[in-house]
Amino acid sequence: MSKEFLYKPTTSTWKIKRLLENDSRLFIIQGGQGAGKTISILMIILDFLNTTYGEVTICSAQSSKLSDTALRDFIKIAQDWNIYNNFKHNSSENTFTNELKNSYCEFIGLDKKDVGKGRRRDIVYINEANKITLQQFTDISARAKLVILDYNPDAYFWAHDLITEDNFINLCYLDNEYLSAQEVANIENYKTLAY
């Protein structure tokens, strides 16, 4: 009997994968609540780390928020896909090493001075990029081969000035077919309340 995975690709996942095929170094992913952008990006990164040599930094404005969100989701997906044991997890450093593929992933908060400077990475993923400064973005992304950033469309910020037709996608909850009926109803109710 085969296992039914809880974490499966959504329309968001496929749209992001197609976007990443473009000839760009920077990819900007906007999406509201329930769009599935973070889970989709983490699934793509986990697949990369499990099949390819590479070094990845996943970061956000605050390390405590990152631990409660993206790090926790990363672990849940790896466990669900039965690949968690492929990684050596250093929980005090928030790092994952796949010794078979010689791949490495670290989770860092950008709330410590100079923490993002000097890292050479294959991929840098900035979760909730609208909560970091342009200088923090420049520091963490300067030596990266590929940069992915996501954000909720709350207000205009520095990333909007970096958007091109080849590096941007806008997702919404309709791109996440695994969203619960209750969450869909909640999101659609926001419209009637004029949020």
Residue ranges with predicted function:
Residues 1-195:
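Phosphate/NTP-binding elements of NTP-utilizing enzymes
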